């Protein structure tokens, strides 16, 4: 290939520049026409500290909640200074092509000095494990029987807005739900609407598999607990606050649940924190809830959107006209037989989306499952790896 001169490069860039800058940016999204059937199909939202994954269920919906500091176990010294002595021999074996022998030497002498991660079962070991924060359960009650089918179902995730949604029609009413984890106010937010007055009835509760207590106080549901430190003592403490605001309708909170009846619009806010880095985590959780609770939903969304776009809009990738008239799962299946460059661009941007959603300044790095986990023992304890 001939070398291009600076002028030739400039002319070539001049031809492609209008294509890159003047074409309307496509709305990058994942979307589906059915609820998620397993956790891996849910849609990840996060701000680097908090995460949520809604499954978009129609009658019963579960949203998995996460906090990047929700770790069991305890600090331990895992240094192994003796390993250094075997490094020259390992290098020699590698240079001689004796990879298997080098690997065996690594296995034998390059183990950590502590007790290790309990072979990926570290929830109650000193190493610990990254665990889910909790499960948010929503039970919806419709004016027609719950057996009545639904139509026009869609759930999706906008990469450009870091906003997920679920919408469908049931009977004569159209319902819509929006979810996001605020980049600025550091809380998890959900908006539920019905297009007919007073047709929104639901119960919302929170729990987790173990180590938790729930109670209600002044209309707010609290979940608190403490994880195992792996040494027979109490470890990381945590607190979750759940609160609902309604523009109309009625609501009442009992020990672990908030009941909403005859509403048209409702807002669900979740604030959370742990003691891993902050001894005053209860005060912080309370303050975050108060600040967000005093803001209008539109203003919360606007601030979140602005902060998100500042990070996300730094990179564009245009590989041609996107074929997003098909749901994402159908595009993926068709991709095996038919080219779809737009899906490749979407995949690239989804990777960026996950990195931005899962990290933030002065927080933990992404672990094996990013910021998201749906059990108390994730894959290989959800360790960070290089």
PLM features: residue spans?
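Acidic, Ala/Val/Gly-enriched low-complexity intrinsically disordered segments
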Residues: 10-11, 386
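N-terminal low-complexity segments that are often proline-rich with Ser/Thr-Pro
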Residues: 4, 384-386
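Bacterial Sec-dependent signal peptides at the C-terminal "C-region" and cleavage site
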Residues: 3-7, 15-26
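Aromatic-residue-lined binding/catalytic grooves and analogous aromatic/hydrophobic interfacial grooves
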Residues: 24-383
């Amino acid at each position: 290939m001939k070398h291009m001169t600076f002028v030739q490069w400039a002319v070539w860039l001049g031809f492609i520049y209008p294509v890159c800058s003047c074409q309307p940016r496509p709305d990058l999204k994942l979307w589906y026409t059915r609820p998620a059937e397993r956790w891996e199909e849910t849609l990840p939202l996060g701000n680097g500290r908090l995460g949520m994954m809604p499954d978009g269920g129609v009658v019963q919906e579960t949203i998995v909640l996460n906090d990047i500091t929700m770790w069991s176990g305890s600090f331990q010294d895992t240094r192994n200074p003796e390993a250094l002595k075997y490094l020259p021999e390992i290098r020699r074996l590698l240079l001689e092509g004796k990879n298997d022998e080098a690997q065996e030497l690594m296995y034998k002498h390059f183990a950590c000095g502590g007790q290790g991660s309990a072979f990926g079962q570290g929830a109650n070991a000193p190493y610990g494990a990254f665990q889910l924060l909790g499960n948010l359960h929503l039970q919806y009650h419709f004016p027609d029987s719950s057996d009545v089918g639904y139509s026009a179902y869609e759930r999706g995730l906008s990469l450009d807005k870091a906003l997920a949604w679920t919408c469908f029609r049931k009977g004569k009413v159209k319902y819509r739900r929006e979810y996001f984890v605020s980049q600025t106010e550091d809380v998890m937010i959900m908006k539920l609407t019905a297009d007919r007055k007073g047709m929104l009835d639901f119960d919302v509760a929170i729990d987790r598999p173990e180590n938790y207590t729930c109670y209600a106080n002044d209309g707010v549901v609290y979940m608190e607990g403490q994880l195992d430190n792996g040494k027979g003592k109490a470890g990381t403490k945590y607190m979750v606050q759940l609160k609902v605001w309604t523009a109309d309708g009625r609501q009442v909170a009992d020990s672990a649940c908030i009941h909403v009846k005859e509403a048209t619009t409702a807002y669900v806010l979740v604030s959370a924190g742990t003691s891993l880095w902050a001894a005053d985590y209860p005060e912080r959780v309370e303050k975050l809830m108060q600040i967000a609770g005093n803001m209008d939903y539109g203003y919360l969304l606007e601030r979140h959107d602005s902060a998100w776009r500042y990070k996300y809009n730094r990179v564009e990738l245009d590989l041609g006209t996107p074929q997003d008239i098909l749901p994402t799962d159908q595009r993926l299946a068709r991709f095996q037989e038919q080219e779809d460059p737009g899906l490749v661009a979407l995949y690239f941007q989804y990777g960026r989306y996950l990195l931005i959603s899962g990290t933030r300044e002065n927080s933990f790095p992404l672990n094996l499952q990013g910021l998201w986990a749906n059990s108390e023992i994730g894959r290989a304890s959800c360790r960070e790896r290089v």
